[in-house]
């Protein structure tokens, strides 16, 4: 049996729907709370071990429930400027970053 490891990094706001859908489809996963380095926003990293022929199905489920959207993000004009130096800018968030890797060995005890 050929196995793959899907590592999916999804926005915290999308994680609930993704996890619920995976559970409904009887796809097991491990959920880890993570934080992005650029926006410092909450993410969830899902580790999903599946058979090779299920990869496409799982990727479609993730894609369906991880919408990209614009959200406001406070920015600093200058580090030396007091609080009134902040302004808001919009950044693209959501979607998913997914890695699919080969699994050399799989054991379940």
Model-found features: residue ranges?
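Positively charged, small/polar-rich N-terminal and surface patches that mediate targeting and assembly
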Residues: 1-109
């Amino acid at each position: 049996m050929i196995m793959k490891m899907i590592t999916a990094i999804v926005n915290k706001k999308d994680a609930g729907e993704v996890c619920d859908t995976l559970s409904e489809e009887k796809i097991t996963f491990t959920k880890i709370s993570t934080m992005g380095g650029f926006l410092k926003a909450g993410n969830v990293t899902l580790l999903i071990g599946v058979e090779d022929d299920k990869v496409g199905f799982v990727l479609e489920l993730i894609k369906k429930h991880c919408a990209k959207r614009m959200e406001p993000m406070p920015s600093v004009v200058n580090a030396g400027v007091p609080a009134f130096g902040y302004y808001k800018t919009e950044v693209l968030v959501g979607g998913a970053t997914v890695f699919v890797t080969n699994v050399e060995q799989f054991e379940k005890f």
